[in-house]
């Protein structure tokens, strides 16, 4: 039998990846067809790939000292950021017979659907300027990721596409880049003072990461001790939209004057860490979810009172009717209480707000959207004012936050996928009369400090989904409410400290899913209700006690 496998790691200085490997008994042959995501070569000075490799995944060949690499003829796919952790890489070469890729003097170009794209620029290539060859159609997201020495990129007249995500554009994290120039005759883009705009001047596409703004003596722009001097950028006249990730990770600006901008796209200013002054003028009519995030010096937003769409409360942006909390400044410290009129906290509203410590939610709040409080590492406490009306907590809403205790109101109906995953929770209490229907996939996954999860009274809960409590190794006991009929795959997988499981009577449990209690090593005894009809494979695998 033959199987396909991926290269994962080697500690050799010279790494020669084999085309095939066999198991110790020579019963099976494995073709090496991929370089795995986050593959490591900590001691390597060179690596040779066989002509069986068809895919190179993101962050390949991490941690080594490799200066050049050759892509074999067989490679068909190279993921975004594939070489983004190869800090010493100066050249990406390509076998001349490869039909999908070529090298432009060490810069990787992909051939796709009869068009060419800049795919990856070597991080340590010593040139300070690079001119994209004429004929190239586009620049991929992360193409110039972490380019150490580049100060100027010139785009050809042929270039028509420069896509981005909510966190990255094609030039993000090229920290010394100060100018993106555009050749004459380009009908898709133009450059204004080194900043990439659409040809009509209505969209700001990308601001070079290392480009400084203009100095200012305006008292409003001056920082506190330890912060850099004011560096201000005024968006050019005519620009109506700041596109996705246009200022992502930009490190040379402290203030933005939006001028006549109407739209701020998702991630427009993501992790622009030195930004501390933002004024939203009356023209701004659209702020997409997570337009700002991770701006650690930004303590308050200013919104022009004449803006008909948005308003600020103590530096926090709301919709004009005060029903939706749009953005919380990531540098705002301490405690915060949402306005009494608030019904929804938007996607990524508090994203990477790492100075907020406590949030009190008004009783009328109904929805906390996806990623709303993700990575709020100092947020230790949240409180829902009574009578709480909260119904939905979205996907990854508090993932990676600093929460230590949680009281879930009876009104809550949905706890979404990984909503509280990887938090510091120690205790969770669900109120009597709970309307919670399901604890969704991974909702409390990886809560390594979780010791207690309690339902105070009646509950409508009918399902505990896959991996809901997986890896919660300090959880010692759990009482499953009587209306729960299904424990899905791996619900308590890896809850190694779990000693007792109790089914509240009259129990209605019918299905215990695959690996539901796998690696619950401390579980000594469980009394299953008579209603159970299905126990899937590995449900109690490695319950060694």
Q: Residue ranges of each PLM-predicted region?
A:
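N-terminal-proximal low-complexity accessory segments that begin disordered
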Residues: 2-3
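Structural signature of tandem-repeat unit edges
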Residues: 10-33, 42-55, 64-77, 87-107, ...
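Consensus positions within tandem repeat domains that build extended binding/scaffold surfaces
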Residues: 58-60, 80-82, 141-143, 243-246, ...
């Amino acid at each position: 039998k033959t199987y396909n496998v991926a290269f994962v790691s080697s500690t050799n200085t010279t790494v020669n990846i084999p085309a095939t490997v066999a198991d110790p008994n020579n019963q099976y042959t494995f073709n090496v067809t991929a370089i795995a995501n986050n593959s490591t070569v900590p001691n390597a000075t060179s690596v040779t790939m066989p002509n069986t490799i068809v895919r190179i995944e993101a962050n390949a060949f991490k941690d080594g000292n490799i200066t050049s690499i050759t892509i074999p003829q067989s490679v068909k796919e190279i993921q975004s950021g594939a070489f983004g952790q190869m800090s010493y890489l100066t050249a990406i070469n390509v076998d001349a017979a490869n039909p999908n890729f070529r090298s432009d003097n060490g810069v990787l170009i992909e051939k796709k659907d009869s068009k060419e794209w800049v795919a990856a620029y070597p991080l340590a290539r010593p040139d300070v300027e690079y001119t994209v060859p004429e004929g190239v159609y586009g620049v991929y997201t992360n193409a110039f990721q972490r380019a150490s020495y580049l100060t100027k990129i010139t785009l050809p007249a042929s270039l028509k596409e420069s896509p981005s995500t909510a966190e990255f554009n094609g030039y993000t994290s090229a920290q010394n880049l100060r100018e993106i120039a555009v050749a004459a005759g380009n009908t898709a883009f133009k450059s204004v003072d080194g900043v990439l705009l659409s040809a009509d001047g209505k969209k700001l596409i990308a601001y070079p990461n290392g480009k400084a703004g203009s100095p200012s003596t305006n008292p409003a722009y001056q920082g506190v001790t330890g912060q850099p001097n004011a560096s201000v950028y005024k968006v050019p006249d005519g620009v109506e939209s700041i596109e996705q990730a246009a200022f992502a990770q930009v490190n040379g600006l402290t203030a933005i004057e939006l001028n006549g901008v109407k739209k701020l796209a998702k991630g427009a200013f993501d992790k622009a860490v030195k930004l501390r002054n933002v004024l939203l003028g009356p023209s701004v009519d659209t702020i997409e979810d997570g337009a700002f995030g991770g701006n650690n010096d930004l303590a308050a937003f200013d919104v022009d009172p004449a803006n008909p769409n948005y308003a600020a409360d103590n530096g926090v942006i709301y919709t004009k009717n005060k029903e939706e909390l749009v953005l919380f400044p990531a540098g705002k410290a301490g405690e915060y209480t949402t306005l009494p009129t608030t019904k929804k906290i938007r996607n990524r509203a508090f994203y990477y707000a790492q100075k907020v410590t406590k949030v009190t939610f008004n009783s009328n709040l109904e929805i906390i959207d996806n990623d709303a409080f993700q990575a709020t590492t100092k947020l230790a406490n949240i409180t829902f004012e009574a009578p709480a009306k909260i119904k939905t907590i979205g996907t990854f809403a508090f993932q990676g936050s600093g929460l230590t205790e949680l009281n879930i109101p009876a009104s809550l109906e949905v706890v979404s996928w990984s909503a509280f995953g990887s938090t510091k929770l120690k205790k969770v209490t669900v109120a009597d009369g709970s309307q919670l229907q399901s604890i969704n996939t991974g909702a409390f996954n990886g809560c390594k400090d979780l010791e207690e999860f309690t339902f105070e009274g009646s509950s409508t809960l009918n399902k505990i989904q896959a991996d809901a409590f997986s890896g919660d190794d300090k959880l010692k006991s759990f009482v499953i409410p009587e209306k729960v009929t299904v424990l899905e795959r791996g619900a308590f997988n890896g809850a190694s400290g779990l000693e007792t499981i109790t089914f509240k009577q009259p129990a209605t449990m019918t299905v215990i899913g695959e690996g539901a209690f796998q690696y619950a090593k401390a579980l000594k005894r469980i009394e299953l209700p008579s209603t159970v009809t299905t126990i899937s494979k590995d449900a109690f695998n490695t319950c060694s006690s």
